[in-house]
Curated annotation (Swiss-Prot):
Alphabetized PROSITE patterns for the sequence: ZN2_CY6_FUNGAL_1 (PS00463), ZN2_CY6_FUNGAL_2 (PS50048)
Xref: InterPro entries: AflR, Zn2-C6_fun-type_DNA-bd_sf, Zn2Cys6_DnaBD
Organism: Aspergillus aculeatus (strain ATCC 16872 / CBS 172.66 / WB 5094)
Keyword Transcription: yes
The organism's taxonomic lineage, starting at the top: Eukaryota, Fungi, Dikarya, Ascomycota, Pezizomycotina
Keyword GTP-binding: no
GO biological process: aflatoxin biosynthetic process; positive regulation of metabolic process
Record's keyword terms, sorted: DNA-binding, Metal-binding, Nucleus, Transcription, Transcription regulation, Zinc
The protein's name in its UniProt record: Transcriptional regulator AacuR
Gene3D superfamilies: Zn(2)-C6 fungal-type DNA-binding domain
Reported function: Transcriptional regulator; part of the gene cluster that mediates the biosynthesis of the tetrahydroxanthone dimer secalonic acid D.
Uses in industry and biotechnology: Secalonic acids show unprecedented anticancer activities against various human cancer cells and might be interesting for further derivatization, targeting diseases such as cancer.
Region annotation (Disordered) ranges: 1-24, 63-104
GO molecular function, one term: DNA binding
Biased composition (Low complexity): 76-102
Length: 363
Protein backbone atom coordinates (compact mmCIF):
# COMPACT_ATOMS: atom_id res chain seq x y z
CA UNK A 1 0.00 0.00 0.00
CA UNK A 2 1.55 3.13 -1.09
CA UNK A 3 1.33 6.25 1.06
CA UNK A 4 0.52 9.40 -0.68
CA UNK A 5 2.41 12.44 0.59
CA UNK A 6 1.30 15.90 -0.27
CA UNK A 7 4.03 18.11 -1.60
CA UNK A 8 5.14 20.83 0.79
CA UNK A 9 3.50 24.16 0.14
CA UNK A 10 5.57 26.64 -1.73
CA UNK A 11 6.70 29.32 0.64
CA UNK A 12 6.90 32.50 -1.25
CA UNK A 13 9.94 34.39 -0.12
CA UNK A 14 9.87 38.12 -0.16
CA UNK A 15 12.08 39.45 -2.84
CA UNK A 16 15.06 41.41 -1.61
CA UNK A 17 15.48 43.13 -4.92
CA UNK A 18 15.17 46.88 -4.60
CA UNK A 19 11.75 48.20 -5.51
CA UNK A 20 11.23 51.18 -7.72
CA UNK A 21 11.11 54.71 -6.35
CA UNK A 22 7.82 56.00 -4.99
CA UNK A 23 6.31 59.13 -6.45
CA UNK A 24 4.01 61.68 -4.91
CA UNK A 25 0.27 61.42 -5.44
CA UNK A 26 -0.06 65.03 -6.63
CA UNK A 27 1.89 66.46 -9.49
CA UNK A 28 4.24 69.38 -9.06
CA UNK A 29 1.97 72.06 -10.55
CA UNK A 30 -1.10 70.99 -8.51
CA UNK A 31 0.94 70.86 -5.33
CA UNK A 32 2.34 74.34 -5.99
CA UNK A 33 -1.16 75.73 -6.63
CA UNK A 34 -2.56 73.79 -3.63
CA UNK A 35 -5.28 72.27 -5.79
CA UNK A 36 -6.50 68.71 -5.58
CA UNK A 37 -4.86 66.70 -8.34
CA UNK A 38 -6.80 64.14 -10.42
CA UNK A 39 -3.77 61.80 -10.13
CA UNK A 40 -3.80 60.52 -13.70
CA UNK A 41 -0.46 59.38 -15.03
CA UNK A 42 1.59 60.30 -16.91
CA UNK A 43 -0.43 63.56 -17.06
CA UNK A 44 -3.31 64.69 -14.90
CA UNK A 45 -6.48 66.20 -16.40
CA UNK A 46 -5.71 69.68 -15.07
CA UNK A 47 -2.27 69.83 -16.72
CA UNK A 48 -3.70 68.48 -20.00
CA UNK A 49 -6.47 71.09 -19.95
CA UNK A 50 -4.04 73.94 -19.33
CA UNK A 51 -1.37 72.53 -21.61
CA UNK A 52 1.20 72.40 -18.81
CA UNK A 53 4.07 70.04 -18.14
CA UNK A 54 2.87 67.45 -15.63
CA UNK A 55 5.67 66.11 -13.44
CA UNK A 56 5.39 63.75 -10.50
CA UNK A 57 8.29 64.20 -8.08
CA UNK A 58 9.84 61.39 -6.11
CA UNK A 59 8.57 61.02 -2.59
CA UNK A 60 11.11 61.98 0.07
CA UNK A 61 9.59 60.01 2.90
CA UNK A 62 12.03 58.82 5.52
CA UNK A 63 12.11 55.06 5.19
CA UNK A 64 14.70 52.38 5.41
CA UNK A 65 16.65 51.90 2.26
CA UNK A 66 16.52 48.45 0.71
CA UNK A 67 19.51 46.33 1.72
CA UNK A 68 20.49 48.61 4.60
CA UNK A 69 20.09 45.84 7.19
CA UNK A 70 22.31 43.53 5.19
CA UNK A 71 25.04 46.19 4.94
CA UNK A 72 24.83 46.80 8.69
CA UNK A 73 25.40 43.11 9.42
CA UNK A 74 28.36 43.02 7.05
CA UNK A 75 29.96 46.04 8.79
CA UNK A 76 29.56 44.40 12.20
CA UNK A 77 31.18 41.22 10.90
CA UNK A 78 34.18 43.07 9.46
CA UNK A 79 34.68 45.07 12.68
CA UNK A 80 34.63 41.86 14.70
CA UNK A 81 37.38 40.40 12.51
CA UNK A 82 39.61 43.48 12.80
CA UNK A 83 39.11 44.12 16.54
CA UNK A 84 42.15 43.28 18.72
CA UNK A 85 41.95 40.33 21.03
CA UNK A 86 41.38 41.15 24.66
CA UNK A 87 43.47 39.56 27.36
CA UNK A 88 41.99 38.54 30.65
CA UNK A 89 43.96 39.31 33.79
CA UNK A 90 43.45 37.06 36.77
CA UNK A 91 44.34 38.32 40.19
CA UNK A 92 45.26 35.95 42.94
CA UNK A 93 44.97 36.70 46.60
CA UNK A 94 48.26 36.68 48.44
CA UNK A 95 48.51 36.46 52.18
CA UNK A 96 50.93 38.45 54.26
CA UNK A 97 52.96 35.32 55.05
CA UNK A 98 53.68 34.42 51.41
CA UNK A 99 57.34 35.06 50.54
CA UNK A 100 56.63 35.76 46.85
CA UNK A 101 54.45 38.78 47.53
CA UNK A 102 56.03 41.98 46.24
CA UNK A 103 56.55 44.76 48.80
CA UNK A 104 54.14 47.65 48.67
CA UNK A 105 55.46 50.96 47.41
CA UNK A 106 54.13 53.77 49.53
CA UNK A 107 53.81 57.31 48.30
CA UNK A 108 56.59 59.50 49.77
CA UNK A 109 55.59 62.03 52.34
CA UNK A 110 57.37 64.81 50.50
CA UNK A 111 54.71 64.68 47.79
CA UNK A 112 51.80 65.27 50.14
CA UNK A 113 49.99 68.57 49.74
CA UNK A 114 48.04 69.79 52.75
CA UNK A 115 45.31 71.65 50.91
CA UNK A 116 44.91 69.08 48.12
CA UNK A 117 43.25 66.65 50.58
CA UNK A 118 39.68 67.29 51.55
CA UNK A 119 37.80 64.96 53.94
CA UNK A 120 34.75 63.11 52.68
CA UNK A 121 31.61 64.23 54.50
CA UNK A 122 29.89 61.47 56.47
CA UNK A 123 26.57 63.30 56.65
CA UNK A 124 24.38 64.45 53.75
CA UNK A 125 24.63 68.03 52.63
CA UNK A 126 21.21 68.94 54.01
CA UNK A 127 22.10 67.64 57.47
CA UNK A 128 25.41 69.46 57.65
CA UNK A 129 23.85 72.71 56.44
CA UNK A 130 21.15 72.64 59.11
CA UNK A 131 23.59 71.76 61.87
CA UNK A 132 26.43 74.15 61.20
CA UNK A 133 24.91 76.97 59.15
CA UNK A 134 28.37 77.88 57.83
CA UNK A 135 28.60 78.23 54.08
CA UNK A 136 32.14 78.84 52.84
CA UNK A 137 33.32 78.18 49.33
CA UNK A 138 36.98 77.20 49.41
CA UNK A 139 37.08 75.87 45.84
CA UNK A 140 38.95 78.86 44.41
CA UNK A 141 41.44 78.88 47.24
CA UNK A 142 42.03 75.12 47.01
CA UNK A 143 42.56 75.37 43.26
CA UNK A 144 45.06 78.18 43.78
CA UNK A 145 46.90 76.31 46.52
CA UNK A 146 47.12 73.21 44.32
CA UNK A 147 48.71 75.19 41.48
CA UNK A 148 51.20 77.07 43.65
CA UNK A 149 51.57 74.62 46.58
CA UNK A 150 51.70 77.35 49.19
CA UNK A 151 51.29 74.99 52.13
CA UNK A 152 52.73 71.88 50.51
CA UNK A 153 56.11 70.54 49.50
CA UNK A 154 57.09 70.70 45.81
CA UNK A 155 57.01 67.55 43.73
CA UNK A 156 60.78 67.41 43.43
CA UNK A 157 61.07 66.67 47.14
CA UNK A 158 63.34 69.66 47.79
CA UNK A 159 62.61 72.82 49.73
CA UNK A 160 61.40 75.70 47.54
CA UNK A 161 64.24 78.09 48.40
CA UNK A 162 65.93 78.90 45.11
CA UNK A 163 63.21 79.95 42.63
CA UNK A 164 63.46 81.10 39.06
CA UNK A 165 62.54 84.71 38.32
CA UNK A 166 59.50 83.98 36.21
CA UNK A 167 56.77 86.60 36.27
CA UNK A 168 54.13 83.93 35.78
CA UNK A 169 54.89 82.74 39.31
CA UNK A 170 54.23 86.24 40.59
CA UNK A 171 50.94 86.41 38.71
CA UNK A 172 49.82 83.11 40.23
CA UNK A 173 51.01 84.17 43.68
CA UNK A 174 49.04 87.42 43.45
CA UNK A 175 45.84 85.37 43.47
CA UNK A 176 46.42 84.44 47.11
CA UNK A 177 45.23 87.78 48.59
CA UNK A 178 42.05 87.58 46.53
CA UNK A 179 41.29 84.07 47.80
CA UNK A 180 42.06 85.05 51.40
CA UNK A 181 39.82 88.10 51.11
CA UNK A 182 36.90 85.94 49.99
CA UNK A 183 37.47 83.56 52.90
CA UNK A 184 37.56 86.41 55.42
CA UNK A 185 34.14 87.57 54.21
CA UNK A 186 32.66 84.27 55.36
CA UNK A 187 31.28 83.83 58.87
CA UNK A 188 33.30 80.71 59.51
CA UNK A 189 36.47 82.82 59.55
CA UNK A 190 35.36 84.16 62.96
CA UNK A 191 36.59 80.92 64.49
CA UNK A 192 39.98 81.06 66.18
CA UNK A 193 41.21 77.97 64.39
CA UNK A 194 40.47 79.51 61.01
CA UNK A 195 42.22 82.74 62.00
CA UNK A 196 45.35 80.82 62.97
CA UNK A 197 45.35 78.93 59.67
CA UNK A 198 44.88 82.12 57.65
CA UNK A 199 47.76 83.72 59.55
CA UNK A 200 50.02 80.83 58.57
CA UNK A 201 48.94 81.22 54.93
CA UNK A 202 49.78 84.94 54.99
CA UNK A 203 53.20 84.17 56.46
CA UNK A 204 53.73 81.63 53.71
CA UNK A 205 52.78 84.16 51.01
CA UNK A 206 55.24 86.68 52.42
CA UNK A 207 57.90 83.97 52.52
CA UNK A 208 57.34 83.18 48.87
CA UNK A 209 57.60 86.85 47.94
CA UNK A 210 60.93 86.95 49.80
CA UNK A 211 62.28 83.81 48.14
CA UNK A 212 61.43 85.22 44.72
CA UNK A 213 63.08 88.61 45.20
CA UNK A 214 66.12 87.71 47.33
CA UNK A 215 67.97 85.61 44.70
CA UNK A 216 67.81 88.70 42.47
CA UNK A 217 69.67 90.66 45.14
CA UNK A 218 72.70 88.37 45.05
CA UNK A 219 71.55 86.04 47.82
CA UNK A 220 72.14 82.33 47.38
CA UNK A 221 69.92 79.91 49.25
CA UNK A 222 70.50 76.23 49.83
CA UNK A 223 68.74 73.65 51.94
CA UNK A 224 70.75 71.98 54.73
CA UNK A 225 70.85 68.27 55.23
CA UNK A 226 68.76 66.42 57.72
CA UNK A 227 69.76 67.41 61.21
CA UNK A 228 71.50 70.64 60.23
CA UNK A 229 68.53 72.99 60.47
CA UNK A 230 68.42 75.83 62.97
CA UNK A 231 65.86 78.59 63.24
CA UNK A 232 67.34 82.07 62.69
CA UNK A 233 65.55 85.43 62.21
CA UNK A 234 66.32 88.27 59.81
CA UNK A 235 65.09 91.85 59.58
CA UNK A 236 67.14 93.52 56.81
CA UNK A 237 69.31 92.92 53.76
CA UNK A 238 72.54 92.85 55.76
CA UNK A 239 71.58 89.71 57.64
CA UNK A 240 72.55 86.36 56.25
CA UNK A 241 69.71 83.98 57.07
CA UNK A 242 66.03 83.75 56.22
CA UNK A 243 63.39 84.00 58.91
CA UNK A 244 60.94 81.50 57.49
CA UNK A 245 61.31 77.93 58.72
CA UNK A 246 60.04 74.81 57.01
CA UNK A 247 58.79 71.53 58.45
CA UNK A 248 58.97 68.13 56.82
CA UNK A 249 56.43 65.42 57.44
CA UNK A 250 58.74 63.49 59.77
CA UNK A 251 58.37 66.28 62.32
CA UNK A 252 61.95 67.57 62.09
CA UNK A 253 62.41 71.30 61.63
CA UNK A 254 64.55 72.52 58.74
CA UNK A 255 65.32 76.16 58.01
CA UNK A 256 67.09 77.27 54.83
CA UNK A 257 70.49 78.91 55.22
CA UNK A 258 71.16 82.12 53.35
CA UNK A 259 74.67 83.10 52.28
CA UNK A 260 75.32 86.51 50.82
CA UNK A 261 76.62 86.48 47.28
CA UNK A 262 78.06 89.27 45.17
CA UNK A 263 75.92 92.43 45.02
CA UNK A 264 73.62 92.99 42.11
CA UNK A 265 75.44 94.68 39.23
CA UNK A 266 73.22 97.54 38.17
CA UNK A 267 73.36 98.57 34.56
CA UNK A 268 73.09 95.04 33.19
CA UNK A 269 70.08 93.39 31.61
CA UNK A 270 69.05 91.84 34.93
CA UNK A 271 68.59 95.25 36.56
CA UNK A 272 65.38 96.07 34.70
CA UNK A 273 63.91 92.66 35.38
CA UNK A 274 64.82 92.86 39.06
CA UNK A 275 63.30 96.29 39.54
CA UNK A 276 60.17 95.25 37.66
CA UNK A 277 59.72 92.21 39.91
CA UNK A 278 60.27 94.34 43.01
CA UNK A 279 57.71 96.92 41.89
CA UNK A 280 55.18 94.18 41.14
CA UNK A 281 55.60 92.64 44.60
CA UNK A 282 55.50 96.04 46.30
CA UNK A 283 52.25 96.91 44.52
CA UNK A 284 50.62 93.79 45.99
CA UNK A 285 51.72 94.32 49.60
CA UNK A 286 48.95 96.83 50.31
CA UNK A 287 46.42 94.05 49.78
CA UNK A 288 48.34 91.85 52.19
CA UNK A 289 48.40 94.78 54.63
CA UNK A 290 44.61 94.99 54.45
CA UNK A 291 44.30 91.28 55.25
CA UNK A 292 46.67 91.67 58.19
CA UNK A 293 44.57 94.54 59.55
CA UNK A 294 41.41 92.43 59.37
CA UNK A 295 43.10 89.52 61.12
CA UNK A 296 44.51 91.75 63.86
CA UNK A 297 41.09 93.30 64.41
CA UNK A 298 39.60 89.85 64.91
CA UNK A 299 42.44 88.94 67.24
CA UNK A 300 41.36 91.86 69.42
CA UNK A 301 37.76 90.64 69.34
CA UNK A 302 38.86 87.27 70.65
CA UNK A 303 40.94 88.96 73.35
CA UNK A 304 37.90 90.96 74.45
CA UNK A 305 35.79 87.82 74.56
CA UNK A 306 38.41 86.09 76.69
CA UNK A 307 38.60 88.95 79.17
CA UNK A 308 34.83 89.50 79.31
CA UNK A 309 32.73 86.40 78.48
CA UNK A 310 29.51 88.47 78.55
CA UNK A 311 30.84 90.76 75.83
CA UNK A 312 28.54 91.01 72.81
CA UNK A 313 30.24 90.86 69.44
CA UNK A 314 27.43 92.77 67.72
CA UNK A 315 28.43 95.98 69.53
CA UNK A 316 31.96 95.88 68.17
CA UNK A 317 31.23 94.60 64.68
CA UNK A 318 31.66 96.99 61.79
CA UNK A 319 30.16 97.12 58.31
CA UNK A 320 33.08 95.23 56.82
CA UNK A 321 33.19 92.63 59.60
CA UNK A 322 30.24 90.21 59.53
CA UNK A 323 28.70 89.27 62.86
CA UNK A 324 29.75 85.78 63.93
CA UNK A 325 27.28 83.09 64.97
CA UNK A 326 26.19 83.04 68.60
CA UNK A 327 27.67 79.64 69.34
CA UNK A 328 31.19 80.73 68.26
CA UNK A 329 31.43 83.48 70.89
CA UNK A 330 32.24 81.05 73.70
CA UNK A 331 35.00 79.23 71.76
CA UNK A 332 38.52 80.24 72.84
CA UNK A 333 40.90 77.82 71.10
CA UNK A 334 43.94 80.03 71.76
CA UNK A 335 44.81 82.53 74.41
CA UNK A 336 45.28 86.21 73.68
CA UNK A 337 49.06 85.82 74.10
CA UNK A 338 49.19 83.45 71.14
CA UNK A 339 47.28 85.87 68.93
CA UNK A 340 49.51 88.75 70.08
CA UNK A 341 52.61 86.80 69.10
CA UNK A 342 51.12 85.89 65.71
CA UNK A 343 50.32 89.56 65.10
CA UNK A 344 53.90 90.58 65.90
CA UNK A 345 55.32 87.94 63.57
CA UNK A 346 53.03 88.82 60.66
CA UNK A 347 53.56 92.57 60.96
CA UNK A 348 57.30 92.13 61.41
CA UNK A 349 57.58 89.93 58.33
CA UNK A 350 55.56 92.40 56.26
CA UNK A 351 57.63 95.35 57.51
CA UNK A 352 60.90 93.54 56.76
CA UNK A 353 59.89 92.65 53.21
CA UNK A 354 58.67 96.20 52.49
CA UNK A 355 61.95 97.64 53.79
CA UNK A 356 64.01 95.38 51.55
CA UNK A 357 62.01 96.29 48.47
CA UNK A 358 62.19 100.02 49.17
CA UNK A 359 65.95 99.89 49.77
CA UNK A 360 66.46 98.06 46.51
CA UNK A 361 64.33 100.51 44.51
CA UNK A 362 65.98 103.51 46.14
CA UNK A 363 69.35 102.88 44.48
Amino acid sequence: MTSLQCPPPDRTRRSLSPTGPKFRESCKSCAASKIRCTKEKPQCARCVKRNMVCEYLESKRARRKPGARLKHRESITTNAHHSPTTTTITTSRTTSSSPSASPKTYHPLNYVDILSWTPTPTLPDSATDTQTGLHCNFDDFLAFSHSTSLLGVPEAGELPVHLTTDFRQLEELNRAPEALDEILQCRCSEDGYQLAILSVVILKVLGWYATIIRPLLGVEAHSPGVGEGTTVRTDSLAETQLSSSFYVDSGQQISPKITMGPPLAYGRESEGKTRMAAQLILSQLHRVQRLVNILCHRFKLHSNREQNPAWNSSTASTATEPEGPAYIEHLYPFSSLVFDQIEKDVRGRLRSLSTELLEMLRY
